[in-house]
């Protein structure tokens, strides 16, 4: 029997290190990599950029198709950003979870609120910078944004951080290796929940209890 995958949401202000943590988590040599994991691929109406492939970076669709999917209630969450739509397909996520794949959604706090309403069992994680000063230093260290853009990102970061207490877990990314260990621990913790183990270890407990099957507990 396939053990259903877990759904995780990771949210963070720009510069907190969320993308780096996700990439490190998914590396084959990570402690959590014994089980299949994948970052969700969003649907979007924006044009593909050079080097982006349909189905790999995004699912590129027309505005008409996206709005049709909205009318069908096909998204766990969606938003319009700078005139383009972005959304997370409910059917695609559920298909991956049913195959035993742990799925990670890289979305903001507003998207997290939408997903929680549809899937209360989702595990939500907020990645926080260690300080305003460090966050600004990281943003400036990229060398790609003007002072005006950095000021805007800092204001947006404050708005993002004001919702930290809506999440199940908070990781402060001060030391990257420690933050990665914290994230890995959360993922492994969810896999050890009784609901998961009663399926994964069904044969074991059937033998221990001398019964044909053990019904998963809520």
Swiss-Prot record:
InterPro entries: GK/Ca_channel_bsu, Guanylate_kin-like_dom, Guanylate_kinase, Guanylate_kinase_CS, P-loop_NTPase. Residues 5-188 form the Guanylate kinase-like domain. Its EC number is 2.7.4.8. It catalyses: GMP + ATP = GDP + ADP. Keywords: ATP-binding, Cytoplasm, Kinase, Nucleotide-binding, Transferase. It is an enzyme of class 2 (transferase). SMART domains: GuKc. Coiled coil: none annotated. ATP binds at residues 12-19. GO terms for molecular function: ATP binding; guanylate kinase activity. It comes from the Bacteria. One of its GO terms (cellular component) is cytosol. It is found in: Cytoplasm. Belongs to the guanylate kinase family. Essential for recycling GMP and indirectly, cGMP. HAMAP family: Guanylate_kinase. This is Guanylate kinase. The lineage of its organism: Bacteria, Pseudomonadati, Pseudomonadota, Gammaproteobacteria, Alteromonadales. The gene is gmk.
């Amino acid at each position: 029997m396939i053990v259903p995958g877990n759904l995780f949401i990771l949210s963070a202000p720009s510069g907190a290190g969320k993308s780096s943590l996700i990439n490190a988590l998914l590396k084959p040599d990570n402690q959590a990599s014994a089980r299949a994991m994948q970052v969700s691929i969003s649907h979007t109406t924006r044009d593909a950029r050079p080097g982006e492939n349909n189905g790999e970076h995004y699912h590129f669709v027309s505005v008409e198709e996206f709005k049709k999917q909205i009318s069908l209630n096909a998204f766990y969450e969606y938003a319009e950003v700078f005139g383009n739509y972005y959304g997370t397909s409910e059917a695609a996520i559920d298909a991956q979870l049913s195959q035993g794949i742990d799925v990670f959604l890289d979305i903001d706090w507003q998207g997290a609120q939408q997903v929680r309403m549809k899937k209360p069992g989702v595990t939500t994680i907020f990645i926080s910078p260690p300080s305003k000063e460090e966050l600004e230093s990281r943003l400036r260290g990229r060398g790609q944004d003007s002072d005006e853009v950095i000021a805007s990102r800092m204001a947006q970061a404050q708005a993002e951080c004001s919702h930290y207490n809506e999440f199940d877990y908070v990781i402060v990314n001060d030391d990257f290796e420690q933050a990665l260990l914290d994230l890995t621990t959360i993922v492994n913790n969810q896999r050890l929940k009784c609901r998961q183990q009663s399926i994964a270890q069904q044969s074991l407990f059937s033998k221990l209890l001398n019964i044909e099957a053990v019904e998963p507990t809520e």
